């Protein structure tokens, strides 16, 4: 094997593999990038980070010397153009267009040429066509006729797809005459095709600009081509992103815009209005107090009759919220464990009635109810499955799928195929009935739960899982689900797509608030009436308006509504005054001048009364209510709201810090647990080593030899005369005879001779070689120490687990 085959290049960084000298390594890197781009959730995914920061890498990719690697590189660039953020795509546009026009469009491989043309069209879709055409035009004067012909063909395809309104024909027409004068026939052929495509969009004005520079033969040929064109006007088949209509709602993008008037006219559902108007009914006192006893009866008829009486009590349009935990526990137990299907059906109907009557107040019982209903969905009878499904839909309507997604997804791996099928069917119905888009976590949980079901051995499970994925794809978009479908084959993907095409969903993208809710300036604007004398008052702003000092009025200084004035910030209230004062009677004037003014222009009391009366009439004629009190209330409540917001933000920040500290503690405890496990395994290994050494110890082999030697010594001692005299002397007082007087030197066998035979007593003496064993095998002390350490480590691990549980809860 060669050195290249022996080395594992997959461990190298992606950036190193992209510029590697081995073309197979570059090929695998390009294919990996293409796959990661197509499976990305959005344009901000981590797979785009390298290319966004180093867009010059595309030059080496698109101009790869190996044709196979170049084809994979162009496919990766097409995926990048299709799935990346357009703002980052514009950075690589100039480099990529030059590389495509010089190397990719002239490639001997058809796949490379198709990818290059698709990349140019995607670059045009991202922003505009002018920068792309501007980068291609220098290639029209290249030395190689093949390069010129391929670039002219690319421009002709762009004009055919986007039209002359998007593709700037003024940049192209001046170069067409030079193309018709080229020596290569392929260049002239592509130039004719380009001219025909432009003529379809521009019409006869093209003749005035072009025919004066062409030969008569070329003009005649073009006239014949123009005559063969269809009479109907051409249609644009590809659009810029700014021209593309809003498609299906997506999780991250695509906000549906609606006018403000349209939003104001939309009315809520009639059922919600009727539910608000219905009076609440307290059903708990009407429940039979012996219900629990009746449901524990061994006769199924008693249980069924109890539920038959309970169902009308719970079938109320609106139920008053109360403590229903005991009742829900009784019903869920009947659903999950009762052997009679009639009792199960009635219990499911009772749960459904409670969910419809309590609505959002039933959400605290939703997880318990869904768990019991899904567990019982193993039944095969249609009436049972229908009752359970209706109850599950009613329960799910009281809560949100974001809260129950993990619980429902846990049943996707159940061994019973009926339960798995019911789980996927519940997902499909919930996706279809959702009125708002789910969170990313919910989408991820549901998709990962449904994908294995598509490959299940049971056909109804496969069909239900494919339907759930198809409806979810319709709800959140293809791109958000494609990343989960990569392990599936084409047959299963086509089945999911068939459900996707026929699925219907209720969820819509959220509307922009700026078009529905008026701004503060719009709220504070006053409506200017037709009668200039009557001043209308508008909504008082939240902030107080400080009146400016009064200035002298003049007829020439008329109020201009277009300019900023007091009406834009609040109502212009009249300022009461004791008497009208002329400009000359201000402070600082001399007393003589004031006397002259008084003498020349005496005050008219009638004019003063008339002015005061006019001011009163202005207030009386005003139909709008005086909002001064409301403005004061708003003024004093506003700081409270700010204070509450600040306290809420500070509490959230403190909770965030506590959460981070708990995470750090969990991390440290986890590391300690790992180290303790390693030490525990080492101690176990040492203990096993000591046990094996004990088995191979020489003491086990020496023990029989000691026994034989001790017995031999005993026999020699028993036959001696001194031993026999001792027996006769001490036999009345000591019936038991030992072979040794010293306790530490006794024989392992205590015996006595009777009729020439030895009899053994039940009380055995201590082994004479026990102390020798301790001296010979000291490893047992080490084993005891290791066992103590092992016990201590196990205790510490248990304490660590208890701390983990406490931190989690």
Curated annotation (Swiss-Prot):
InterPro entries xrefs: ARM-like, ARM-type_fold, TOG, XMAP215, XMAP215_CLASP_TOG
Region feature Disordered, mapped onto this chain: 233-274, 507-608, 619-638
Sequence ranges of the HEAT repeats: 127-164, 167-204
Main location: cytoplasm
Coiled coil: 637-697
Keywords: Cell cycle, Cell division, Centromere, Chromosome, Coiled coil, Cytoplasm, Cytoskeleton, Kinetochore, Microtubule, Mitosis, Phosphoprotein, Repeat
In-chain residues carrying the UniProt-annotated modification Phosphoserine: 543, 548, 697, 720
Biased composition (Basic residues): 509-518
Comp. bias intervals (Acidic residues): 262-274
Recorded GO MF terms: microtubule binding; microtubule plus end polymerase; microtubule plus-end binding
A GO biological-process term: cytoplasmic microtubule organization
Cystine pairings recorded for this chain: none
Composition bias, Polar residues: 239-253, 597-608
Ranges of compositional bias, category Low complexity: 526-551, 582-595
Pfam family, one: XMAP215_CLASP_TOG
GO cellular component, one term: meiotic spindle
General function of this protein: Required for bipolar spindle formation and proper chromosome segregation. Has a role in connecting the kinetochores and the plus end of pole to chromosome microtubules. Also required for the activation of the spindle checkpoint pathway.
Family, similarity comment: Belongs to the TOG/XMAP215 family.
Subunit structure: Interacts with alp14.
Protein name: Spindle pole body component alp14
């Amino acid at each position: 094997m060669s050195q290249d085959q022996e080395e594992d290049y997959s461990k190298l960084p992606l950036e190193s593999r992209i510029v590697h000298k081995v073309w197979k390594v570059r090929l695998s890197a390009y294919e990996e990038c293409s796959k990661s781009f197509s499976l990305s959730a959005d344009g901000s995914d981590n797979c785009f980070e390298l290319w966004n920061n180093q867009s010059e890498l595309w030059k080496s990719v698109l101009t790869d010397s190996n044709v196979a690697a170049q084809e994979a590189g162009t496919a990766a660039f097409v995926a990048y153009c299709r799935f990346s953020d357009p703002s980052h795509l514009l950075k690589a546009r100039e480099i990529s267009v030059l590389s495509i026009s010089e190397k990719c469009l002239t490639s001997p491989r058809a796949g490379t040429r198709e990818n290059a043309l698709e990349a140019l069209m995607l670059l045009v879709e991202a922003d505009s066509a002018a920068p792309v055409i501007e980068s291609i035009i220098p290639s029209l004067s290249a030395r190689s006729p093949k390069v010129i012909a391929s670039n002219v063909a690319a421009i002709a395809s762009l004009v055919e797809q986007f039209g002359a309104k998007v593709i700037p024909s003024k940049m192209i027409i001046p170069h067409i005459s030079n193309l018709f004068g080229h020596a290569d026939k392929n260049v002239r052929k592509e130039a004719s095709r380009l001219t025909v495509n432009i003529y379809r969009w521009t019409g006869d004005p093209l003749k005035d600009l072009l025919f004066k520079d062409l030969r008569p033969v070329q003009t005649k040929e073009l006239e014949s081509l123009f005559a063969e064109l269809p009479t109907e006007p051409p249609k644009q088949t590809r659009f810029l992103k700014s021209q593309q209509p809003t498609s299906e709602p997506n999780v991250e993008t695509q906000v549906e815009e609606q006018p403000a008037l349209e939003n104001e006219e939309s009315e809520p559902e009639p059922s919600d209005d009727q539910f608000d108007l219905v009076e609440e009914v307290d059903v708990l006192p009407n429940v039979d107090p012996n219900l629990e006893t009746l449901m524990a009866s061994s006769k199924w008829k008693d249980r069924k009759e109890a539920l038959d009486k309970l169902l009308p009590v719970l079938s109320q349009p609106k139920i008053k919220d109360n403590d229903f935990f005991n009742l829900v526990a009784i019903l869920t137990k009947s659903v999950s464990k009762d052997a009679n299907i009639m009792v199960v059906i009635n219990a499911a109907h009772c749960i459904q009635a409670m969910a419809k009557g309590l609505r959002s107040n039933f959400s605290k019982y939703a997880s318990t109810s869904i768990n019991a209903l899904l567990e019982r969905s193993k039944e095969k009878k249609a009436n049972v499955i229908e009752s359970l499904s209706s109850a599950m839909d009613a329960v799910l309507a009281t809560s949100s799928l974001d809260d129950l997604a993990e619980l429902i997804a846990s049943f996707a791996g159940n061994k019973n195929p009926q339960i798995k099928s019911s789980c996927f069917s519940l997902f499909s119905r919930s996706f279809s009935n959702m009125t708002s888009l789910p969170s990313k976590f919910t989408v991820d949980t549901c998709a990962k739960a449904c994908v294995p079901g598509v490959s299940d051995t049971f056909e109804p499970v496969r069909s239900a899982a494919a339907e759930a994925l198809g409806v979810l794809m319709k709800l959140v978009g293809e791109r958000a689900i494609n990343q989960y479908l990569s392990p599936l084959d084409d047959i299963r993907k086509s089945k999911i797509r068939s459900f996707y095409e026929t699925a219907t969903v209720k969820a819509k993208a959220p509307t922009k608030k700026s078009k529905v809710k008026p701004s503060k300036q719009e709220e504070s604007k006053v409506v200017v009436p037709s009668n200039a004398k009557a001043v209308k008052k508008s909504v008082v702003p939240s902030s107080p308006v400080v009146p400016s000092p009064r200035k002298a009025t003049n007829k020439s200084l008329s109020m201009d509504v277009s300019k900023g004035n007091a009406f834009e910030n609040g109502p212009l209230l009249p300022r009461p005054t004791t008497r009208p004062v002329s400009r000359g009677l201000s402070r600082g004037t001399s007393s003589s001048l004031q006397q002259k003014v008084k003498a020349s222009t005496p005050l008219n009391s009638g004019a003063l009364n008339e002015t005061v009366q006019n001011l009163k009439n202005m207030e009386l004629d005003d139909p709008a209510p005086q909002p001064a009190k409301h403005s004061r209330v708003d003024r004093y409540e506003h700081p409270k709201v700010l204070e509450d917001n600040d306290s809420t933000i500070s509490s959230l920040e403190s909770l965030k810090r506590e959460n981070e500290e708990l995470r750090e503690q969990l991390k440290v405890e986890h590391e300690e647990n790992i180290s303790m496990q390693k030490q525990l395994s080492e101690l176990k290994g040492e203990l096993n080593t000591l046990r094996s050494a004990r088995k191979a110890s020489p003491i086990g082999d020496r023990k029989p030899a000691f026994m034989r030697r001790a017995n031999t010594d005993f026999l020699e001692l028993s036959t001696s005369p001194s031993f026999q005299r001792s027996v006769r002397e001490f036999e009345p007082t000591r019936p038991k005879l030992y072979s040794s007087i010293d306790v530490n030197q006794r024989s392992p066998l205590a015996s006595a001779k009777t009729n020439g035979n030895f009899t053994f007593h039940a009380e055995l003496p201590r082994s004479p070689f026990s102390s020798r064993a301790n001296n010979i095998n000291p490893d047992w002390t080490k084993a005891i120490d290791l066992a103590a350490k092992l016990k201590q480590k196990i205790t510490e691990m248990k304490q660590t687990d208890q701390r983990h549980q406490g931190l989690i809860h």
